[in-house]
A protein has these predicted regions:
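Short, structurally constrained coil/turn elements
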Residues: 19, 53-55, 125, 155
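Short, solvent-exposed mixed-charge patches
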Residues: 209-211
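Boundary at the C-terminal end of the N-terminal hydrophobic targeting segment
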Residues: 18-25
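Bacterial N-terminal signal peptides
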Residues: 7-18
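Conserved SGNH/GDSL esterase-like catalytic core that processes O-acyl groups on lipids
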Residues: 27-113, 140-143
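Positively charged n-region of N-terminal signal peptides that target proteins for export
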Residues: 1-4
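Alpha-helical cap/lid subdomain in secreted, periplasmic
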Residues: 77-207
């Protein structure tokens, strides 16, 4: 099988960075872990995007240039996959997870691995997974989007698809020349899209008291 591959821009990032610790005496904020590759890098290098996402949430950014879903990344040394990071983090993964990964993946391997990743998250206490579609600038990314939508039908109650591909359509100014990586404006718009969804789903603000 011929592997399809489109390289991502390498962006120097720390593997796991947490923001928005609660003030003393206040109820802790709901914890969100964001897994992404260099496309999601705007969440760390653009303070405006970071401010949007951390409003009302404790956010752990786990972003790796050239990152992949279940295979080591495409640079040397290769960053660990999302699956490997979930295994390493264990219960330190937040109960809410956001995933924006796939630009460096083969669609067939992505299809074989997505259920494995979701099972690993569920075993570690994850209750909600918000999975973003890719900008479908080629057939590879269109196929991965089909995999994402297919998985959501199998994982109702755990996985919610955020259709970034549709939401961003017609907004060329949100992207670099490759149509994938984000401009400063695009990073803010992606952050707003994710944050708005978290609020709508009740996954923003202080941790709710036990029922």
């Amino acid at each position: 099988m011929r592997r399809l591959f489109v390289p991502s821009l390498a962006v120097a990032l720390c593997c796991s960075v947490a923001y928005a610790a609660p003030a003393a005496g206040k109820a802790p904020l709901q914890h969100v872990t964001i897994f992404g590759d260099s496309v999601a890098a705007a969440f760390t290098w653009d303070p405006r995007a970071r401010t949007v996402l951390t409003e009302g949430n404790r956010v752990t950014f786990d972003l790796s240039p050239c990152g992949r879903l279940t295979e080591p990344g495409c640079i040397t040394p290769p960053p660990p996959s999302v699956f490997k990071k979930v295994e390493l983090l264990g219960r330190r993964v937040g109960p809410t997870v956001v995933v924006l990964v796939g630009y460096n993946d083969d669609p067939h391997i992505y299809r074989a691995g997505i259920d494995k990743v979701l099972r690993a998250m569920q075993r570690r206490g994850v209750e909600h997974v918000l999975w973003l579609t890719l900008r479908a600038v080629n057939k590879q990314y269109l196929l991965i989007n089909q995999v994402i939508h297919g998985a959501s039908a199998r994982w109702r109650g755990l996985m919610t698809v955020l259709d970034w591909n549709s939401f961003s359509r017609g907004h060329a100014g949100w992207f670099a020349s490759d149509g994938i990586h984000l401009s400063a404006l695009g990073g803010v718009q992606l952050a707003i899209y994710v944050h708005r969804t978290l609020k709508r789903m009740g996954l923003n603000g202080p941790v709710p008291p036990p029922a």
